[in-house]
Every structure is written in structure tokens, then in C-alpha cells.
């Protein structure tokens, strides 16, 4: 368990002792998931075995012990915890702690999925994998509210800030990938409605939150809106050195959200396919990129004119199948390690 401000000096309590600012217990798990992402980009099995798996194993087994059954449904939920950093109204009062908030459930689902994926790749099947798989099947997952939005909590609760800067409950769409247009289009619609609702209710933007929203819009295939948000971030939050201001100081999340969004406008690889120019903004009608990495250990150079691809060069670092998708058409390449392919 680690709050989002836990650091090398063992600062452990919720930020300023406010539950809605720091009582979220899956933040360390979010960081752990980067181990599996590193493997997906490199296919480095030695890294997977010696670095990623030990971390994923400990994290997954912790949550197997942490989860408890929801007495209403029997499904497993995390808690008590808060959905960073939103609050809700109940019985005329403001509260923040609950059981099974969407943010926690999505990150725990990803943790279980990544651990089981790593074990499958390494040929591991034992009591621990069986236990984790059983818990994963019993997880309570978010549902859609009566107004069509993705629910932030297990009940339909009225948030205190409709335009709250955090979009924690949309984690499963971005940076997670449980929610995709290919497999869960109904949830994608709910994510879009949730995001539109926030943006249309006097959205309380910070530099880092604008970065997250910019990336979310790119993944939602809304390129022009993503670019508008990116430019708004630059003109209102950027410092002269390109750091992004948040509460009078730069934060690392501020600087990473926008570059990620720029990449996702041009290339996305979080599904079974590698999508080329999936969210290209109208203003970027002509362009060229080199050295873009994709999951599966592929490196892309691309050029486009008038919004259309005119050349694509793919270098395969490890070999294997490469599934490309462009304008709804799918092309499968069988590649060899170290070779390049020009389309």
C-alpha cells in the first residue's frame, strides 16, 4: 500500500491528512504495471523473469489477500479507499471513503491480468496462478449509470464537484486497456459521456490533468479535441523551459501526459492491432515521424500527406507477427528479428 505522496522519507499518511487527497491504496500497483509494459515493448524475457515477475507476483498476491466480498453482490472489492480526489454526497453530508471504487478495481484487474500473462509467457502454472485467476473472475467491475456515464463508485452517488480535475474512474480506458472500442464499445461510450460531463461542468484543470485528458481524447480517436486540449495546456500551463505548472510548481505527470498524447495521435498499440494514424488531427495534414516504438518490439518510421499515409517502415526487433490496422483495414506481417519492412 502506498499513497500517491509516499516517498523515500516514508511519508505514509494521506496528503494533509485528507482521505480524498491520499487514501488511495493502488498507486504503487499502478507503478508496478510499468514492468509489464516494458516487456511488451521489448519482449525481453530475461527482464520479465528476473525483474517484472517478482514485482507483479508480490503485488497480485497482496491484492488477493486485500480484497473482501461485497455483501450485496458477493463480488470482491477493494477498500476502504477513495477515488482520487473526488468526493460524494450521502445523507446530506460529504464523504470520500467507500468500497470498490472504479479506480481501484481497474488497477487490480490489470495487476492480475499482467501477472497471469507473465506467468503464461514463462510457462508457470501453479497454486498462485490458480488463486489469482479465481480472484480476478470474482472482481467487481464498474458498470454504467442511468445517465450513461461510467460509474465512479459501486453506487450511483452525486459527486461534490461535477467538473473535478481527476478522471480516475476512466483509468481502464487510459492508461489501462481493459476498455477498448474493439471489445467493449458500450464502455467506451460511457467513458466518452463521463469525460464530456466533466469538461462541460466548469472543469477544474491542472497541467497534469490536462495531460491526462489530452491522452484520453487521443485514445478515444478524437484527434482535433486532443490537439485543442494540448494547445490549451501549452498556452496556459507551460513554463519557459516546457515544464508544466501545477499549483505553482512543476510535476512529472504534467510533462509526460502531452508527449504520450502526441504519440497516440499517430500510433496506438494497446490492443491486438497496431493502429496507424488512429487519431490524426486535421491540422496535422502533412507530417513525418521516425523511431516510434510499438508493443511487440517494433519501431516505426511514417510519413503522410493530406492526412494519408504515403510510406511506412517497420523494424522488427524480435521477430514475430505484426498486425497493422489503417483506415479499418488489417494487414498481417510475418517478421524476422532485425529486419525492416517497407509498406
What are these regions (language model features)?
Residues 73, 224-343:
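Non-catalytic C-terminal accessory modules of carbohydrate-active enzymes
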Residues 9, 13-45, 50, 101-273, ...:
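Active-site core of glycosidic bond-cleaving carbohydrate-active enzymes
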Residues 35-60, 65, 69, 78-84, ...:
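Primarily short, surface-exposed interaction patches in extracytoplasmic proteins
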Residues 79-81, 132-138, 277-284:
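A glycine-rich phosphate-binding loop feature that marks nucleotide/adenosyl-phosphate handling sites
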Residues 81, 156, 176-178, 305, ...:
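Structured loops at beta-to-helix junctions and adjacent beta-edge loops in soluble globular domains
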Residues 1:
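Carboxylate/His-rich catalytic cores and anion/metal-binding grooves
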Residues 54, 80, 175-178, 281:
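Proline-rich low-complexity regions
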